[in-house]
A protein has these predicted regions:
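C-terminal motif of bacterial Sec signal peptides marking the signal peptidase cleavage site
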Residues: 24-27
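Long, low-complexity, serine/threonine/proline-rich intrinsically disordered regulatory regions
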Residues: 15-17, 31-35
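Intrinsic disorder/low-complexity segments enriched in polar/small residues
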Residues: 8-9, 41, 71, 242
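Bacterial N-terminal signal peptides that target proteins for export
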Residues: 3-18
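Short linear recognition/processing motifs and adjacent strand/loop elements at protein termini
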Residues: 29-31, 59-264
Length: 264
C-alpha cells in the first residue's frame, strides 16, 4: 500500500511540474492581436497618401493652384469637382495663341437662366512660394466653360470700335477672349459680375486688367503683365480649368497664371 501511495504522489508531482511548465511558456508567447489591431497604423498611412496627391494628376478634392483665390470665405459644402491644366507653362506670343474649345448647347439652360456661360466673378491672388512663383487672375463662370483664346498683343483694342484700351505701366498685354460667353443680364442693362478686384491690381507680374468687350457672345479682357523692363520678357503663362462648388454656386473657373520669376 505504501508503494502505491508513493507512485500516486510521484505521478501527481510530475503532472504539477508539466502544468507549471505550460503556464510559463504561455506567459512568454505574445497573444494574437485582435482583428483590426493594426488599423490605426494603416489608417495613418492611408491618410498620408491622400494628403499628398500627385501634382501631375490632381484629385477632384485636392486644393490646386486654380482654387487658391476664392472671392469669399469658404463655406460648408465648398469643394473642387475637377481640375486640369489646359495650358502648361509656355509663351502664347503674337501669332501663336492658345485656344481652348468647349462645346455647349445654346441655350445652355432654359429661361429664365442665361443662355450662355455667364461671368459671375473675377478673383486675383499672388503665389510667391510656388515653383515657379506666379500671379493669378481667375474668371469664374456659371453654366459651363466657354471657349477662349489667350495671346500676347502689342495693344489692347476694344471690340467693335477698335479704339485703344489703356493699360498704363505694364510691360506686356495678354488678351483673353471668351467665346460663347457673356457678362451682362438678359436685358443688357447690368453686369453679372458680382465680385472683382480693382482694375489696378499692382502685383509683380499681374499689374492690372481691363474689359475690352461684351457683345454677341464674345467677352474680352486685357491683362497687364509686369512692370516695363529694359528688354521684352517673354512671360510664361499657365491656364487651369477648375469646376467647383463655391459659396453654394456651381462655378467653372478659368485661371490665368503668370510666371512672376522675372520680378522677384
Amino acid at each position: 500500500m505504501g508503494a502505491i501511495r508513493a507512485q500516486k504522489t510521484a505521478a501527481r508531482n510530475v503532472g504539477l511540474g508539466l502544468l507549471a511548465l505550460l503556464l510559463t511558456l504561455t506567459a512568454c508567447t505574445p497573444s494574437t492581436p485582435p482583428p483590426g489591431g493594426s488599423s490605426q497604423a494603416t489608417g495613418s498611412a492611408s491618410a498620408s497618401s491622400a494628403a499628398a496627391p500627385s501634382a501631375a494628376a490632381p484629385s477632384a478634392t485636392a486644393s490646386v493652384p486654380g482654387d487658391t483665390d476664392e472671392t469669399g470665405p469658404p463655406q460648408t459644402g465648398d469643394k473642387v469637382i475637377s481640375s486640369k491644366i489646359a495650358l502648361d507653362w509656355s509663351w502664347p506670343g503674337p501669332g501663336r495663341p492658345f485656344k481652348a474649345t468647349h462645346e455647349n448647347p445654346v441655350p445652355i439652360s432654359p429661361p429664365p437662366a442665361a443662355p450662355l456661360p455667364t461671368l459671375a466673378a473675377i478673383g486675383a491672388g499672388q503665389h510667391p512660394a510656388e515653383t515657379p512663383p506666379f500671379d493669378q487672375l481667375s474668371f469664374r463662370f456659371s453654366g459651363g466653360f466657354p471657349s477662349y483664346d489667350v495671346v500676347f498683343v502689342p495693344e489692347l483694342l476694344a471690340d467693335g470700335s477698335g479704339l485703344p484700351v489703356p493699360l498704363p505701366g505694364t510691360g506686356a498685354i495678354l488678351r483673353v477672349v471668351f467665346r460663347g460667353a457673356q457678362a451682362h443680364t438678359a436685358d443688357g442693362t447690368a453686369s453679372t459680375v458680382k465680385s472683382a478686384p480693382a482694375p489696378n491690381i499692382g502685383y509683380k507680374a499681374l499689374t492690372s486688367y481691363a474689359p475690352a468687350g461684351d457683345f454677341e457672345g464674345v467677352l474680352s479682357y486685357g491683362i497687364g503683365v509686369g512692370r516695363p523692363m529694359g528688354t521684352v520678357t517673354e512671360t510664361k503663362v499657365r491656364v487651369y480649368e477648375v469646376e467647383k462648388i463655391e459659396q453654394g454656386q456651381h462655378l467653372y473657373v478659368v485661371a490665368i497664371q503668370l510666371d512672376s520669376t522675372q520680378w522677384k
